[in-house]
């Protein structure tokens, strides 16, 4: 009995002295803000680019807004070997808990995405709240860009760009966790934000200084290019392969379907009704600005309902939108808005939003046959037994032919008597 009591006391005391297995002194770490991964398909080399900030340049444990960090790249046959080479060129321990963005080049997204995700999942220190970015060309070029008018680390700048600006629908944030969930969930394909760098090309700035240790081509230091960033569009995947880009309008259509909280301006024609009984391309607006209505979208949400009739699934998309009409309108008739005019404006706004939705459906259901919408996942969630019995193994084949109905309900809220028709003398 005494031995048992003594053993319990010893075991309970041990728990008071436990520590972190990966503990490191703050002064001995290199804070990683950006991680970029590229692939050279000519020789099957993987290039990893890390942007880090030395803790010696921080103030009181906080990173100064004016610190841009340093960008290093290493080339190897595997991801882990490239990271190890970067560790050899870094005085502090590489510390990924500050990671803001994971940037993947287009070739890497096409050929080695599975290896990238496997490495991320095996590295517990990498934050799954960091954003996944797909960029055309090379990730190392994006990471080594710095805004001369707002000199902060590119990873933090891109993160702020995606979070600090109201969602205009042309792109949206996707975290590592969300991206992996889309990869493993049934009936949905992955998407990720598209970010590009803008600015002038400068030969001197694009040159890289050689770093001692290893061969000169294995590890290099990037002198940062002056430029800025633009986030627009989305990258789409089928399984673990990158398959194409969504442009601004297609991304907006996908945002309507997914129920993203969109804050953006929307314009419609005043003198033409559009027939949406079949899939249609975008409306080409008349250059006459007198025939254009302008709205500001204040709220949006959607609901996807899947019905099964005689084993044939049907997708119903219901989108609700609230909008504000700009202060003046250019229609004919009464000086102030009448209920009939308001109803007509709401119908035109609904048709314009429906056009966005049908455009992205036409391309990705009918042409590329990739379920980036998650219709299959909604079928699985709403009818799990039928999904496993009839659709799980054949969804890719039947998805392009599934009928889709779209209903948009738009409400204009600011239609008081202060909204007057614009008179120009």
Model-predicted segments: where are they?
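Sec-dependent signal peptide recognition
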Residues: 2-10
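Membrane-proximal alpha-helical signals and transmembrane carboxylates
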Residues: 5-6, 15-425
